[in-house]
Structures are given as C-alpha cells and as structure tokens.
C-alpha cells in the first residue's frame, strides 16, 4: 500500500515533499500523468532534491515524434529500459544527429540543444533525469497533460488544450519549436 502526501503541486502525491528525507517508491507508484499517448511517472522532483535534479520514466506506444523543443537551463538524460526510442538532437552549432536507443543505451542532451524523440516500439520506456540551475521540469507533464491514477497508457491520446501551449511550457523551461526541420532522415 502506498502512502499519499499532499503537496503544493498535487492534492495526493506518492512522493514525500520534505527534502533531505530518504524514501522508497514501488515500481509505477510515483506521481503519474498522461500526455499525448504516454504515461509519465515521476519518482523524485525538485521538492525532494532542492531543485537540483528530477528522475522520471516515460512509457509510450510506437507513435509520432514528440515535438522538437529546447531547454535554456536544463540538461536532460535519456536512458532506455524497454523497447526502442529514436532520439534526435541538434547542437548549438546546428549539427544534427539521430540515434536509435535500445535497452541499456544512453543519450545526453545539454541545455540549449534542440531535441525530440519517438517511441519506435510499443511499450518503450525511457528513464529521464533532468537538472539545471533554474529548477526542474517534472511538473510540466501533468500541467500540460493531466495527472492520472492509472498505471497504464491512456486509452486515447491526451492532447493538451490550446491555451496550455502558450503558458505551461515557459513555466518549466520548455520552448517548443514547431517549424523545426530534422535533416537527419
């Protein structure tokens, strides 16, 4: 049985809000959110780490490219644990790369580098870690998407309401680049 905590972000969270306190979370029992066709589970966020990093998983179906975006202050890690994920990156000099990551593969995206990804197999899963001086962005997922109590993928993709696209990303160091073109394929 999981313990629930009230935090400033959620009325019921599986993560204790007190920084500096050890805790344990069973598989899948973090703070869950649906965004697009994905299930995001946050295990540690800014509240626990004094805004030094976050730790989350993203599980999704084979599908569309997550839109190109950039973080001005946040470095991001992609570590694939299940399936396959294609990671697209563009460095600050404009050089583009893409790589198919399979279980055990790792990708690092420094701040200010445009990136996107696509799940290449059903039920692919990525462990994400993000860190930066301005705080962490784990609450982005539930604010652009929606918190959920479900353990699985959404039955229908959760497409954000249009008004959220203008306010939510900027609060969490996410800038979408809708006109960005990937020249790698």
Residue ranges and their predicted role:
Residues 1-53, 155, 159-185:
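A short, N-terminal "cap"/entry segment at the start of jelly-roll beta-barrel domains
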Residues 73-86, 90:
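Glycine- and acidic-residue-biased ligand/ion/polar-headgroup-sensing regions
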